[in-house]
């Protein structure tokens, strides 16, 4: 469960309400780290991860695999949905994306080791219960691994790096064994710099022939897609947690290393990197080489090639192996993760808290809705004059008691 050996919205109508599914509305999901979270811009879907066993103390356990938690980014409400079908095993360190409201899940680490299985779940389904489907893809798959990254471009999912088993088939790229894994596992593992493409129309795996200087093998790094560039920052390789920044041109498959001007974030793994505009990435948290959890946030300006430290109110809330998703309202929603040294298992402080970072100016609609809510007593008699979809938004917000980050 560690970072090596520790290791535009489619329209202006309301999105799917998920009210028709068999569900259970609770306050929030359990605390966790190593989970996945993806977004359709209005909802954040959370699956998997693990937490400490509160009864036995020294043991970690994976969260229930059937549970899919959906966070409404507008109202701040959580909903739990119990999924069915080819449900993936409970895992940590998996890699997930959401494309056109379809969730794709690859890799991870479960109770029997690493996996390279691929799953999908269509959140647009009209069935009463959301169904997982395991896809038997064509071509040579990536090796079994966790803590890898992914870029989404056109009809392709492009996976990079990770920590796991030696590939069984010949692949392009470098694999470096972790010597310490020979002592504590019958299946030694290591880091890699492999690039694998999955075509989501044919479900076929392939590898591109890349040019330029590739990044070193790594795991627990962070990836983000902007245009035709797949960015990767940091991650762990052997005993170092790095702060290098690279991008892969997803048309030409050429690697480029970026040397930003001025100050840069310290090296880290288990951090998040989120695209927030066509020119900016948002970096938060992580874990340093000297095993310190981080609470700093940065924005990277692509056109200026520079990092800028981002001021925020959560400096006393470090997070590592958390998740971060961008909303349609210019916010980054951070969920879960660990607040201290994750490697001291019996003391790991896993979180289930939401941290909200406003990284873009709020829209006029959002500002107007907040004003209506602020002066609700004064304006209540005029609510029926609002368009139906805005009235729906106001009513939903009144039903929420989650004001974190506002």
Curated annotation (Swiss-Prot):
The keyword Phosphoprotein does not apply. It is found in: Nucleus. Pfam families: Kelch_KLHDC2_KLHL20_DRC7 (PF24681). It comes from Homo sapiens. Its main location: nucleus. GO terms for molecular function: ubiquitin-like ligase-substrate adaptor activity. Changing residue 177 to A: Impairs oligomerization of KLHDC2-ELOB-ELOC complex. Impairs oligomerization of KLHDC2-ELOB-ELOC complex. Changing residue 269 to E/L: Abolished ability to recognize truncated SELENOK with a diglycine (Gly-Gly) at the C-terminus. Changing residue 373 to R: Impairs oligomerization of KLHDC2-ELOB-ELOC complex. This is Kelch domain-containing protein 2. GO terms for cellular component: Cul2-RING ubiquitin ligase complex; nuclear body; nuclear membrane; nucleoplasm; nucleus. Kelch repeats lie at residues 31-85, 92-136, 148-207, 221-259, 271-311, 322-359. Pathway: Protein modification; protein ubiquitination. Changing residue 189 to A: Does not affect ability to recognize truncated SELENOK or cleaved USP1 with a diglycine (Gly-Gly) at the C-terminus. Widely expressed, with high levels in skeletal muscle, heart, pancreas and liver. Undetectable in peripheral blood leukocytes. Disulfide bonds: none annotated. One of its GO terms (biological process) is proteasome-mediated ubiquitin-dependent protein catabolic process.
């Amino acid at each position: 469960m560690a970072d090596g050996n520790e290791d535009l919205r489619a329209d202006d109508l309301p999105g799917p309400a998920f009210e028709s599914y068999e569900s259970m509305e609770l306050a929030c999901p359990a605390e966790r780290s190593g989970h996945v979270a993806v977004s359709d811009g209005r909802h954040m879907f959370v699956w998997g991860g693990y937490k400490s066993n509160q009864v036995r103390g020294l043991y970690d356990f994976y969260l229930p695999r059937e549970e899919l938690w959906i966070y409404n980014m507008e109202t701040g409400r959580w909903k739990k949905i119990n999924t069915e079908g080819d449900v993936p095993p409970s895992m940590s360190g998996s890699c997930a994306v959401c494309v056109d409201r379809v969730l794709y899940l690859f890799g991870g680490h479960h109770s029997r080791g690493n996996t390279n299985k691929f799953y999908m779940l269509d959140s647009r389904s009209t069935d009463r219960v959301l169904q997982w489907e395991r896809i038997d893809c064509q071509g040579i798959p990536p090796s079994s691994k966790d803590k890898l990254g992914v870029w989404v471009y056109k009809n392709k999912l492009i996976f990079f790096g990770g920590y796991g088993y030696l590939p069984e088939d010949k692949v392009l790229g470098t694999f470096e064994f972790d010597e310490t894994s020979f002592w504590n596992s019958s299946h030694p593992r290591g880091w890699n710099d492999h690039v694998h493409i999955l075509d989501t129309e044919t479900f076929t795996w392939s590898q591109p022939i890349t040019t330029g200087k590739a990044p070193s093998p790594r795991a627990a790094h962070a990836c983000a897609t902007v245009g035709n560039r797949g960015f990767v920052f940091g991650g762990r390789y052997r005993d170092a947690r790095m702060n290098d920044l690279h991008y892969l041109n997803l048309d030409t498959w050429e690697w480029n290393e970026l040397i930003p001007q001025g100050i840069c974030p310290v090296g880290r793994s288990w951090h998040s990197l989120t695209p927030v505009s066509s020119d900016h990435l948002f970096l938060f948290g992580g874990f340093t080489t000297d095993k310190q959890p981080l609470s700093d946030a940065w924005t990277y300006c692509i056109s200026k090639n520079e990092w800028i430290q981002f001021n925020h109110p959560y400096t006393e809330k470090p997070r590592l192996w958390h998740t971060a998703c961008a909303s349609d309202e210019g916010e980054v929603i951070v969920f879960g993760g660990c607040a201290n040294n994750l490697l001291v298992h019996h003391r790991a402080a896993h979180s289930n808290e939401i941290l909200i970072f406003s990284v873009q100016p709020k829209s006029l609609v959002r500002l107007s809705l907040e004003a209506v809510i602020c002066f609700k007593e004064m304006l209540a008699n005029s609510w029926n004059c609002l368009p139906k979809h805005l009235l729906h938004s106001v009513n939903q917000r009144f039903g929420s008691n989650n004001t974190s980050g506002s």
